[in-house]
Regions:
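PLP-dependent class I/II
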Residues: 1-174
Length: 174
């Protein structure tokens, strides 16, 4: 299987190194050489500090502890958000399998009104929720206009506050 596998990853999300512009590839040598040749002609090299920091992130025990702690923290936020949304009338939410987002079906609220404006689709839902201080991303941007995307890549306190505001918004829909 190894000869048929290509893995491409980066340091941004796993190691909180956004902006460092470091990625890596694991692949059979012929593919790695071709990718390396293409990459050398399309991008400049990453700075040496970012390269050394990435090696340290990938090889240090301290880094592994950081990742474990971060995973636990995100899992706590995910569980709270999923439980809260699944208990909210009118929202259908499958269990998220990756990243730090949930994709909630809110179409049960379409046709209702907030401050005299009708919720017609995910974009109008997002725009009206924003008036209540809740930022969501319309699902239409991801191919499902019945849904909204919410992030739990924020503090647990902010997750709780955002969900409280979302529930207040939903309660005001008539």
């Amino acid at each position: 299987m190894k000869e048929h596998t290509v893995v491409i990853n980066g340091m941004s999300k796993s190691y909180s190194m956004t902006g460092w512009r470091i990625g890596y590839l694991a692949a059979p040598s012929d593919i790695a050489k071709a990718v390396s040749s293409m990459q050398s002609h399309t991008t400049s090299n990453a700075c040496s500090i970012a390269q050394y920091a990435s090696v340290a992130a990938l090889t240090s025990d301290e880094s592994n502890k950081f990742i474990e702690n971060m995973q636990k923290t995100f899992d706590e936020r995910r569980k709270y958000m999923v439980k809260t949304l699944q208990e909210t009338k009118g929202i259908v939410l499958p269990e998220p399998k990756g990243a730090f987002y949930v994709f909630a079906d809110v179409s049960a609220y379409y046709g209702k009104k907030f401050a005299g404006e009708e919720v017609k689709d995910s974009l109008s839902f997002a725009n009206l929720a924003l008036k209540k201080g809740v930022a969501v991303v319309p699902g239409a941007a991801f191919g499902d206009d019945n849904c909204i995307r919410l992030s739990y890549a924020i503090s647990l306190e902010d997750v709780k506050e955002g969900l409280k505001r979302l529930k207040e918004f939903l309660a005001e829909l008539k």
